[in-house]
Regions:
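Conserved alpha/beta cores of soluble small-molecule-handling proteins
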Residues: 1-109, 113-116, 143, 153-216
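Short amphipathic alpha-helical face segments that pack within enzyme cores
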Residues: 146-150
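Glycine- and Gly-Pro-enriched alpha-helical subdomains that act as flexible
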Residues: 108-109, 116-139, 144
Length: 216
């Protein structure tokens, strides 16, 4: 589909759904074809447009904050697969999320092959130290998500310094505040990592302000 035809198909799906607020997921697959890995054998790609309600976390967790563990499952190195690619291959993320469930946590932090923070299973990671808002760069394996980009503008409006740099778990342990962002999740406070309290152990004031700003 051409760009405008695709945009109209999305609008048509939204109109047919009748929702004023919802989540749009656009999926493009290689379409029908024989068994095998070669996409050239599938000349007719398939486009799927999904419009639905999406609740990633229960409302109570936005008020209390979530507990996160560090997964043994690592993020694929950026040199192997470009983290800017938004694909349906979530196997490593699913494995990490299962680790979180087994540990009684809500989410799992994924490190890259060098042991630095990449992202969580479906969200970008942020740590606040003073007026510095820290987040891993995409080169560490983090997806350059939509909400992450919006957060950059909101941080500047709040007078925060936006800092993309390598982060270890220690940087999260000693952070004043920590939170995750995602298109569906929005802004999710993190109050503990691997059983260690972060900040006051409650959602911090900057996290709450950024969350409120995202909705204005």
């Amino acid at each position: 589909l051409a760009r405008e035809a695709l945009a109209e198909a999305v609008r048509e799906t939204v109109r047919a759904n009748g929702q004023e607020n919802g989540y749009i997921r656009l999926v493009v697959t290689r379409g029908d074809g024989p068994l095998g890995l070669d996409p050239i054998t599938c000349p007719h790609p398939r486009t799927i447009i999904i419009v639905a309600d999406l609740t990633v976390y229960p409302a109570a967790l936005y008020a209390s904050g979530i507990r996160v563990i560090t997964a043994a499952t690592r993020q694929v190195a950026a040199a192997c697969v470009d983290p800017r690619i938004k694909s349906l291959n979530y196997l490593k993320n699913v494995l990490a999320r299962l680790e979180a469930h087994a540990a009684g946590a809500t989410e799992a932090l994924m490190l890259n092959a060098e042991g630095f923070v990449a992202e969580c299973t479906a969200d970008n990671v942020f740590a606040l130290r003073g007026n510095r808002l820290l987040t891993p760069p995409a080169t560490e394996g983090a997806l350059d998500g939509i909400t992450r980009a919006v957060m950059r503008d909101l941080a500047h409006a709040e007078g925060l310094r936006w800092c993309e740099e390598r982060l270890g778990r220690y940087d999260l342990f000693v952070a004043d505040e920590c939170f995750l962002t995602g298109t569906g999740a929005e802004v999710v406070p993190v109050v503990a990592l691997d059983g260690r309290q972060i900040g006051t152990g409650t959602p911090g004031p900057v996290t709450r302000r950024l969350s409120a700003a995202l909705h204005t």
